[in-house]
């Protein structure tokens, strides 16, 4: 059983593999927590293969949250309690601890599946005579409220807020705010129903 499967199983496996994964998570926590401007609750499970680096910002990961192998957390990022970030997902926030425009803010009990990308800035490209690489970025914060499920291979564009209790279907590209308790899908993502069961279209 892999580290990710062990996390998905609720960390309940009373075997040698379970012990090995718990030890691995402890090592991952210790490595990440000693980095500058990184605060991780001691109850978190962090794979040693995860990449956690605050760069010029700060990272906070709340009680009981998990970060799976090969997930990336960089820059200004806050993750609440009981949330999970699965393998190969990328969270990149911008700014500094004092200037949090461009931060990524994840609430409590949020599920982020594999290969999700959330970036707190977009490249500027207004001037066609100037290389895009030299035009800088436009920082805009991303907020994921509590109890949200983001399925695999989702892209969330800078400046978006995803409302509490929402579901983002696999492969969606979210370009605008998502209302609370809605289900969105598609490219660009649109509301296909509310969790109450009421279809919108």
What residue ranges belong to the model's regions?
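Extended, small-residue-rich solenoid/repeat segments and analogous flexible loops
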Residues: 1-58
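Flexible, glycine/small-residue-enriched loop-and-beta-strand segment within the central core
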Residues: 50-61, 66-158, 187, 195-198
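Short alpha-helix at the nucleotide-sugar/activated-sugar donor binding site of glycosyltransferases
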Residues: 111, 166-167
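Catalytic-loop signature of eukaryotic-like protein kinases
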Residues: 147, 165, 182
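Beta-rich strand-turn-strand
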Residues: 153-165, 172-176
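Conserved G/P- and acidic residue-centered "switch" motifs that form tight phosphate/ATP-binding loops
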Residues: 168, 186
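Glycine-centered loop/turn positions within well-structured domains
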Residues: 176, 180-182, 190
């Amino acid at each position: 059983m892999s580290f990710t499967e062990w996390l998905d199983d609720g960390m309940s496996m009373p075997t040698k593999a379970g012990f090995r994964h718990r030890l691995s998570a402890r090592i991952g926590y210790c490595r990440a927590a000693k980095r500058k401007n990184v605060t991780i609750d001691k109850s978190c499970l962090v794979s040693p293969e995860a990449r956690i680096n605050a760069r010029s910002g700060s990272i906070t990961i709340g009680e009981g949250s998990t970060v799976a192998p090969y997930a990336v957390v960089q820059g200004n990022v806050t993750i609440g309690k009981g949330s999970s970030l699965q393998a190969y997902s990328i969270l990149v926030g911008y700014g500094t601890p004092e200037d949090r425009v461009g931060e990524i803010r994840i609430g409590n009990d949020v599920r982020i599946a594999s290969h999700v990308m959330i970036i707190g800035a977009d490249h500027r490209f207004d001037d066609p005579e100037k290389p895009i690489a030299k035009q800088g970025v436009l920082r805009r914060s991303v907020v994921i409220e509590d109890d949200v499920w983001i399925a695999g291979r989702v892209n969330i564009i800078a400046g978006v807020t995803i409302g509490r209790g929402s579901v983002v279907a696999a492969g969606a590209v979210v370009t605008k705010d998502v209302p609370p308790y809605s289900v969105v899908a598609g490219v660009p993502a649109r509301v296909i129903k509310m969790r109450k069961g009421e279809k919108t279209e």
